[in-house]
Regions:
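Conserved N-terminal catalytic/coupling substructures associated with nucleotide/phosphate chemistry
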Residues: 1-133
Length: 133
């Protein structure tokens, strides 16, 4: 299955599962606690066997996810280099995640999908904590 097809499937029915984590927004450029929170999600997914972090959706009271109105208007912060620098700072052992910005179905808006690999030979752990810890 191509990445594009896989992303279309993920976004056709956004929900959290053991291998999918959904976040409304994270300020990874300006807030070190948000960078640490992203690293924590990546660690959990990596230890589970891999998965995806979807940025740009919020959970409604009924449990459904919809595109977030609070996400940053610019997705410029979400590059592979930026996410890899967070992984280098907080995650051990180092891993390579792919970061894709893609269109939200039936919308002109975009979201971010981070693909987290699984199958690590040793447990993935935090190299350092958030600044508040």
């Amino acid at each position: 299955m191509s990445n594009e097809t896989q992303f279309e499937k993920l976004l056709s029915d956004v929900r959290e599962t053991l291998d999918i984590e959904v976040k409304e927004t994270l300020d990874i450029a300006g807030d070190p606690n948000h960078r640490a929170a992203l690293a924590k999600e990546i660690i959990a997914l990596a230890n589970h066997g891999g998965g995806f972090v979807i940025i740009g959706y919020e959970e409604k009271e009924d449990g459904d996810f919809v595109p977030s109105v609070n996400r940053k208007p610019s997705m410029m912060d979400w590059s592979t280099d930026k996410v890899q620098s967070i992984i280098s700072r907080y995650v051990d052992p180092h891993m390579q995640c792919s970061v894709t910005q893609t269109s939200i179905p039936n919308s002109e808006d975009r979201c971010v999908i981070i693909a987290v690999p699984g199958g690590h030979k040793v447990p993935v752990r935090a190299k350092s904590g958030s600044p508040d810890n």
